[in-house]
UniProtKB/Swiss-Prot annotation:
Taxonomic source organism: Mycolicibacterium vanbaalenii (strain DSM 7251 / JCM 13017 / BCRC 16820 / KCTC 9966 / NRRL B-24157 / PYR-1) (Mycobacterium vanbaalenii)
Function: NDH-1 shuttles electrons from NADH, via FMN and iron-sulfur (Fe-S) centers, to quinones in the respiratory chain. The immediate electron acceptor for the enzyme in this species is believed to be a menaquinone. Couples the redox reaction to proton translocation (for every two electrons transferred, four hydrogen ions are translocated across the cytoplasmic membrane), and thus conserves the redox energy in a proton gradient.
Topology relative to the membrane: Peripheral membrane protein
Disulfide bonds listed in the record: none
Enzyme class: translocase
Originating gene: nuoC
Disordered: annotated span: 1-20
Pfam families named in the record: Complex1_30kDa (PF00329)
UniProt name for this protein: NADH-quinone oxidoreductase subunit C
Transport as UniProt keyword: yes
Entry's family note: Belongs to the complex I 30 kDa subunit family.
Length: 225
């Protein structure tokens, strides 16, 4: 996402070309394209629809001061409400979203890892889509951690269905979910080095002979950012 159409976007980097590739020629026709890489900024009130009701109910349940310390930013982007939450407050916020009768987000639908190498001190993100069956509502909570300290509290005791989702996010992105009952790799071998869905993970591969020419593996001829 570029975020250029959002209020006060947070610019975290610059992308050159169609795909941000480096190390070889660009065949897309967009080699000179330069775009800012930005995350959506905080959204102003009113958020629209039921989003205001959700934010107001959460602030009322937590208390104004705790809400201000817990929720770093409220973002409405492409008709989705995301609450960016401080990682130390993640469990308390999630439990309130689940248990408060005015909120009742009973289901956590998964965990998505995201790697933003240019988001200084917030390179690793985890996103949790939540659903309220009681009120027929959907929101997301998002939490960030730095590469140097990739620890996030596990939501297993609040939403047990996050069990394998957190394991997969750990496996592919290296986020460590503190308090998880069995945080081990779930798809890659136990002795695998690195986390394959991070943007700094080498593409890998082997040399290939094609029409008499030897083509080097992808990680030697091109890198993406």
């Amino acid at each position: 996402m570029t975020g250029d159409d959002e209020p006060d976007p947070e610019v975290i980097g610059v992308r050159r070309g169609m795909f941000g590739a480096k190390g070889s020629g660009d065949t897309s026709g967009y080699g000179r394209l330069i775009r800012s890489v930005a995350l959506p900024g905080s959204s102003p009130r009113p958020y629209g629809g039921y989003f205001d009701d959700v934010v107001d109910a959460l602030e009322s349940a937590l208390g104004h001061d705790v809400f201000a310390e817990s929720v770093e930013r409220v973002v409405v982007y492409r008709d989705e409400l995301t609450l960016e939450v401080h990682r130390d407050r993640l469990v308390d916020v999630a439990q309130t979203l689940r248990d408060d009768p005015d909120l009742r987000f009973e289901l956590c639908l998964g965990v998505s890892g995201v790697h933003y190498p240019d988001d200084a001190d917030r390179e690793l993100h985890a996103v949790y889509p939540l659903m309220s069956i009681t009120h027929n509502r959907r929101i997301r909570i998002e939490v960030a951690a730095p590469d140097s300290d990739p620890h996030i509290p596990s939501l297993f005791r609040v939403y047990p269905t996050t069990d394998w989702h957190e394991r997969e996010t750990y496996d592919f992105f290296g986020l460590i979910f503190d308090g998880h009952p069995a945080l081990t790799r779930i798809e890659m071998p136990d002795d695998w080095v690195g986390h394959p869905q991070r943007k700094d993970y080498p593409l890998g591969g082997i040399p290939v002979e094609y029409h008499g020419a030897e083509i080097p593996p992808p990680d030697e001829r091109r890198a993406y950012s």
